[in-house]
From Swiss-Prot:
Name the record gives this protein: Sulfur carrier protein FdhD
Function according to Swiss-Prot or TrEMBL: Required for formate dehydrogenase (FDH) activity. Acts as a sulfur carrier protein that transfers sulfur from IscS to the molybdenum cofactor prior to its insertion into FDH.
Annotated source species: Shigella flexneri
Gene: fdhD
Compartment(s) where it occurs, according to its Swiss-Prot or TrEMBL record: Cytoplasm
Keyword field contains Cytoplasm: yes
Keywords, alphabetical: Cytoplasm, Molybdenum cofactor biosynthesis
GO CC field: cytoplasm
Catalytic-site annotation from UniProt: 121 (cysteine persulfide intermediate)
């Protein structure tokens, strides 16, 4: 049998994060064809010269990712704690070089962990199980959301996934206004990274978290809940299911968690008092 070698083609699309490669279909193994595949690269977040975490991510909107990660992990309290940021190539991927305030950097050094995650993984590298959970202040109850507005948002979620439409390989996170309109959506090969990009962008733009909800195309893990709550998000909608730990965290921090979101369908796990129908 003749050996074949996979051939990678120069990126000929206009979309960052997509590359064309040569591949074979099941019904025609004799003739290769070109198809689009989502890029996944190691991204190191380097604070004041010290590498803190390496995540696998899509190579775009990395400044938003770094800001959102810093906020949702409790490294900073506001975007003002970051004095500067640069994205630079490294030997095997990309580095986001972040200049923290002295006070925040001292706090980071006290709890620093070496983390090398798989795609969007935020638990890998934690030294003890007790370190997984982060203290989250209970959220206020400032709004109600009409579930009838959810259906239109679900139909438009993939508008924020240009890479996903080409490759079938990304998750999306978007902000949903009370009207059901989606604004400020982001995509990534990692669901946690997509959420961090959304959190970072809205925080940088000074947007309120109290008039609307986050909608994600993935399941709702405990970390998705925790990241949302750390930034003040009161309602999280997920297209897929929630885990038991996600439900426990949502209950504890007063976050309204909704899963299995499809047109005409939704499962409310916690705090339904924020919802109407």
């Amino acid at each position: 049998m003749k050996k074949t070698q996979r051939k990678e083609i120069e990126n000929v699309t206009n979309i960052t994060g997509v590359r064309q490669i040569e591949l074979w279909r099941r019904d025609d193994l004799q003739h290769p064809r070109l198809d689009e595949v989502a890029e996944e690269v190691p991204v190191a977040l380097v604070y004041n010269g010290i590498s803190h975490v390496v995540m696998m991510a899509s190579p775009k909107d990395l400044e938003y990712f770094a800001l959102g990660f810093s906020l949702s992990e409790g490294i900073i309290e506001s975007p003002r704690d970051i004095f500067g940021m640069d994205v630079v190539p490294s030997c095997n991927g990309l580095e986001v070089q972040i200049e923290l305030s002295s006070r925040r950097f001292m706090g980071l050094k006290e709890r620093r962990r070496a983390l090398a995650g798989r795609t969007g993984c935020g638990v890998c590298g934690v030294e003890q199980l007790n370190d997984i959970g982060k203290p989250v202040q209970p959220l206020p109850f400032t709004q109600t959301f009409d579930l009838n507005k959810l259906d239109d948002a679900l139909r438009h979620l993939n508008d924020f996934q240009p890479v996903g439409r080409l490759t079938g390989c990304t998750h999306a996170a978007a902000w949903m206004l009370p009207s059901g309109e989606l604004v400020g959506g982001h995509e990534d090969v990692g669901r946690h990274v997509a959420l961090d990009k959304l959190l970072g962008r809205r925080s940088q733009e000074g947007e309120s978290w109290q008039q609307g909800a986050v909608l994600v195309s993935s399941r709702a893990s405990y970390e998705m809940v925790q990241k949302s709550a750390m930034c003040g998000v009161e309602i999280l909608f997920a297209v897929s299911a929630a885990t038991t730990l996600a439900v426990e965290v949502a209950e504890r921090c007063n976050l309204t968690l909704v899963g299995f979101c499809k047109p005409g369908r939704a499962t409310v796990y916690t705090h339904p008092q924020r919802l109407s129908n």
